[in-house]
Swiss-Prot record:
Protein name: RNA polymerase II-associated factor 1 homolog
Keywords: Coiled coil, Isopeptide bond, Nucleus, Phosphoprotein, Transcription, Transcription regulation, Ubl conjugation, Wnt signaling pathway
Any one GO molecular-function label of the UniProt entry: RNA polymerase II complex binding
Disulfide bonds: none
Ranges where the record places region Disordered: 1-23, 361-533
Biased composition regions of type Acidic residues, renumbered to the chain: 375-398, 458-470
Localization, UniProt: Nucleus
Organism: Pongo abelii
Oligomer and partners: Component of the PAF1 complex, which consists of CDC73, PAF1, LEO1, CTR9, RTF1 and SKIC8. The PAF1 complex interacts with PHF5A. Interacts with POLR2A, TCEA1, SKIC3, KMT2A/MLL1, SUPT5H, RNF20 and RNF40. Interacts with UBE2E1.
UniProt modified residues of type Phosphoserine: 117, 456
Length: 533
């Protein structure tokens, strides 16, 4: 073979193969890009995860008032496309004895899907979450036609278990049967645990609503940490926290916060004396409480969105178990001290008990009626009494003569007609005001929660009247209220406070402390005078 001559340029080209000569990628941007850095590669392979939640949860549409008030024009035919024969009413009468066509009978039959009992198909439909699929595009169906997508492997809750556990009653008969079954199940004796066969009951007690304490609204108070004082522990700390009180206050800048008050030693002695004498409180005694902590508060009640119902149980020996409702949930978080703002650590709460007023008694009657599932019907009771009186009067008139009978019958007829008219008016007013009552109940509940924490104007007016009476009755400068003074003078404020107890113990108070969070609830209607330096 003849020799060949290779130049220097050909040698350099030989070391650079043609496969490495790539043209620059064409950009999809029309204008010239100054910085054309390409995106980095994805660090991991894509994962096809099923999104278990509703995709419309973040884009819920809410119509404005302008759209709601706009009236669209409906251009339709006079008969709306339905020709009605007003002359012959038998035209649309249905004959119940007519036999349906076989094709129509099939359409009316309910579709019942028979469960597949093939063991091979069940084994084939199993999903192994740790095994990776070898195909990029999967139809999620196998040759047996059973879906390979299991809700149990989805992120979130088990959707399949949620639907299988809920029994859906489609007709009225099934609902009645289910309700009757609950009464039959309640009569059966409990021999073992519903899910643990080896667990047997030690004692079986009936569960009833707490008719005695339901009239008092209870609140659940959740602390971010243990509110017990650092210098005490054990039984002494539990005793102090069981008698603690929370009260809404306001600092110099006008910011509201919740103060946590603990009883002083003298108050503990008085409460112990009252317990030994089997009395709730001494009418003439004054109980002092000192401030221990300051908290920011967050209140949720039935009117709040996303509120979950909460109940607590009271065990009474020899009587049974009673449950009550916690209609308000208060979360307290520690309040940070601000620079230049005077702290209320020297505040003193003076508590003096009083009898409930008419407004509070009416609220208790309303809660009792709510538990009994009906509202107090005072008007109906008065009507029944008047009818009985009229019936008694008519008997006497029958003995006297026939003329009085005629007059009494006419009066009764006129009275019954007026009662019917009044009943119709009451029903119409109840229907028209049902929507307003629901909204007013939510607003009243929110206002009552704020009133229980921060007090009300009506209580302050009542307290001012009681101050005038105390000044007129005081002799020798003696007073039940104690003031705390400072070098520059003290500020004195009086207010009424109401606090309720969610205690399952007969003593009337409960407090449970934990490391991460503790819950407390406070009981009883009281009059509180707060003196702060």
């Amino acid at each position: 073979m003849a020799p060949t001559i290779q130049t220097q340029a050909q040698r350099e080209d030989g070391h650079r193969p043609n496969s490495h000569r790539t043209l620059p990628e064409r950009s999809g941007v029309v204008c010239r890009v100054k910085y054309c850095n390409s995106l980095p590669d994805i660090p991991f392979d894509p994962k096809f995860i099923t999104y278990p939640f509703d995709q419309n949860r973040f884009v819920q549409y809410k119509a404005t008032s302008l759209e709601k008030q706009h009236k669209h024009d409906l251009l339709t035919e006079p008969d709306l496309g339905v020709t009605i024969d007003l002359i012959n009413p038998d035209t649309y009468r249905i004959d119940p004895n007519v036999l349906l066509d076989p094709a129509d009978e099939k359409l009316l039959e309910e579709e019942i899907q028979a469960p597949t009992s093939s063991k091979r198909s069940q084994q084939h439909a199993k999903v192994v979450p740790w095994m990776r699929k070898t195909e990029y595009i999967s139809t999620e169906f196998n040759r047996y036609g059973i879906s390979n997508e299991k809700p149990e492997v989805k992120i979130g809750v088990s959707v399949k278990q949620q639907f299988t556990e809920e029994e859906i009653y489609k007709d009225r008969d099934s609902q009645i049967t289910a309700i009757e079954k609950t009464f039959e199940d309640a009569q059966k004796s409990i021999s073992q645990h519903y899910s643990k066969p080896r667990v047997t009951p030690v004692e079986v007690m009936p569960v009833f609503p707490d008719f005695k304490m339901w009239i008092n609204p209870c609140a659940q108070v959740i602390f971010d940490s243990d509110p017990a004082p650092k210098d005490t522990s054990g039984a002494a700390a539990l005793e102090m926290m069981s008698q603690a009180m929370i009260r809404g206050m306001m600092d110099e800048e006008g910011n509201q916060f919740v103060a946590y008050f603990l009883p002083v030693e003298e108050t503990l002695k008085k409460r112990k004396r009252d317990q030994e004498e089997e009395m709730d409180y001494a009418p003439d005694d004054v109980y002092d409480y000192k401030i221990a902590r300051e908290y920011n508060w967050n209140v949720k009640n039935k009117a709040s969105k996303g509120y979950e119902e909460n109940y607590f149980f009271i065990f009474r020996e020899g009587d049974g178990v009673y449950y009550n409702e916690l209609e308000t949930r208060v979360r307290l978080s520690k309040r940070r001290a601000k620079a230049g703002v005077q702290s209320g650590t020297n505040a003193l709460l003076v508590v003096k008990h009083r009898d409930m007023n008419e407004k509070e008694l009416e609220a208790q009657e309303a809660r009792k009626a709510q538990l009994e599932n009906h509202e107090p019907e005072e008007e109906e009771e008065e009507e029944m009494e008047t009818e009985e009186k009229e019936a008694g009067g008519s008997d006497e008139e029958q003995e006297k003569g026939s003329s009085s009978e005629k007059e009494g019958s006419e009066d009764e007829r006129s009275g019954s007609e007026s009662e019917r008219e009044e009943g119709d008016r009451d029903e119409a007013s109840d229907k028209s005001g049902s929507g307003e009552d629901e909204s007013s109940e939510d607003e009243a509940r929110a206002a009552r929660d704020k009133e229980e924490i921060f007090g009300s104007d009506a209580d302050s007016e009542d307290d001012a009247d009681s101050d005038d009476e105390d000044r007129g009755q005081a002799q020798g400068g003696s007073d039940n209220d104690s003031d705390s003074g400072s070098n520059g003078g003290g500020q004195r404020s009086r207010s009424h406070s109401r606090s309720r107890s969610a205690s399952p113990f007969p003593s009337g108070s409960e407090h449970s402390a934990q490391e991460d969070g503790s819950e407390a609830a406070a009981p009883d209607s009281s009059e509180a005078d707060s003196d702060s330096d």
